[in-house]
Every structure is written in C-alpha cells, then in structure tokens.
C-alpha cells in the first residue's frame, strides 16, 4: 500500500502522521534525494506511477504459466466485484530465462540471512542480520527496534517495500562493449568487470580469468569471497556494480555500517532473453527491463543512501563523481575505471543503460494490520 492508498482506505490522520516522511511524500517527490533526474525524472515516468495514482501493488507468483493465468483471472474477478477499486495497470513479470537480468547475467545471488528465520547464512555471509532490519518491531543492528507506524497492530510485523521499474537499453550496452572490445573475449571480460561477476554468476574474485558456470550455479561457493586481498580493485574494480551495492569488507572512504544497508531483493526481468545481436535502435521498443523490488524496515533510507552515495557517486571508494556503470544515471558520457598495473585503465562512453520508468514507496502490512485496516472502513 502507498501512503495515498492508506489515506483512501480511511486510515485516520493521527496514524498516517506516524509513517516516515519519505513514505508520506512518495517516491516521485523524493526525486532529488534519489537522483532521479534527466531521463529518470518523474515527468518521464509511466502514468501508473505518476504521483497519487498508485494506491496498491498486488504481486502474484505461480509455479507455471497455466497457474498464473488462473490466479490472474481470479484476481481480476475479485477486483471487478470490489467497489471503489480500479485496476490502472498490470505487467506480467518473468522473462523466458528469469534467473538472468536483461543483460544476460545471473541475478539475485547474494541475499542476507535473517536472524531467527531458521535459514543459516550461506558461505560468504559472515552472520545473519538482525530481524529488525527487515521486519518492524524487532531488534535491529543498532540494538533497538526501529521506529514504526502506530498503533502496534498496524506497524508491527510489517515492512516497507521499494518498487522501481527500469527499461534496459540492451542495444546501447552491446554497442558500448563492441566499441571497447576487439574480440568476443574482450567484450565478455569488460562486461564482467562492470558487473563484478561473469554472466553465469561466477564472481571475478574466485574466477578472475574466465567464466565458470559450475561455480556460478553453486550457492555454496558463488558468494563465498571477500575483497581483503583486492583492496585496490585490480581483480574486481572498486566501481563495479556488485562491489558498489555490497562493498563487503572493502575499505570505504565514507564510513558506514554495510549491514544496515542490506536488503532482501527480487529483480524480476521482463522481455526477450539477452542477445548480443540487439542493436541500439531496438531499445526504442522498451520491451526489455526489470522490476527492482526489495524489502527493508528502512527501505526509503536505504534506497536514497544507495542512490546518492553508492550508485551515483564514487567518493566512498575515491572515484570522485564516477557512477555505477550498470544502474547509474549518466546524463553525459560517463567513465568506468579498471585499476591495473602500471596504470589504471579509464573507459569513457558509459551511458544510462537502465532508464527509470516509475516507482513507489509501499508499506507491506502484517495479517494483524490487514485486520486493523478492515476495521477502519
């Protein structure tokens, strides 16, 4: 539920005011904090995401297409029978190879374990993260529960969700690789340097010279690494996508507790599978992209921090204004630095390869909160 959705459900003002300010304002109003400028600015978003339009986001998962069609039909029938509810848009997630992102890289490999969930950390995760970082009402990494909406029946066991939709400019990405790589091997190596992993998901740290599909597919190994032996980023560049969004034990100029910025995420890809034959002219179709969805008890703070400091700036690893080569906003040609001896290699011409098409801050209520909300009607 968005803040406007809670208002439409009749939540009293006294309770609405207990929600955090960024959530109350909505994602579009936080464009400056999110660095959603230029092509990513709210005025360029799809209508469904324009301010005030989206009240509720319903996600339906199923084991196969037939089960999904059945679930969607049921949902549409129930919506049609519900007074005061209008379906303003829908999007079918799930590319043919949904485990990979639009650029052909295996995605959603690194996820934090949650303390008390019964799921042990995989090799490479030092320890489980306090449950209060993800679910409201429990101990967080600072030793105390984070603030939550009141009353407790509304806030406790709920969480916040960030939803962001991107169109992926796969053709421009391919053209960039071809402009800076003479051979197919050169292009694959550059792409891996930009992501921090090979397409299979194998981390550069463990397989620096070539892809290793067996390693990439093994959850007991594909996340079992750190950066202590690569402080200068000569194997995994300091500014690559993976190292920015999960610095692990990297030495950071901007001091922060990495664990308070961990998220449980799901990137849902849509559109045709990746092909190296996709050209820049094909990007105009807008048929490839992903929904970036994550939950966190401080989701609004985390995404704004990530967008400001880790994605659209490089000061925290002494890279100045250099930005994330995959999801950063490059209003002019950007730069990507690959540290190497004797001199680092700088590659110009990085573009905005993922263009923002809309998003919203959402509150995911608990079962007790759903009951409380129903009682307000």
Which stretches of residues belong to each language-model region?
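Long, low-complexity, Ser/Thr/Gly/Pro-rich intrinsically disordered segments that act as flexible linkers
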Residues: 1-377
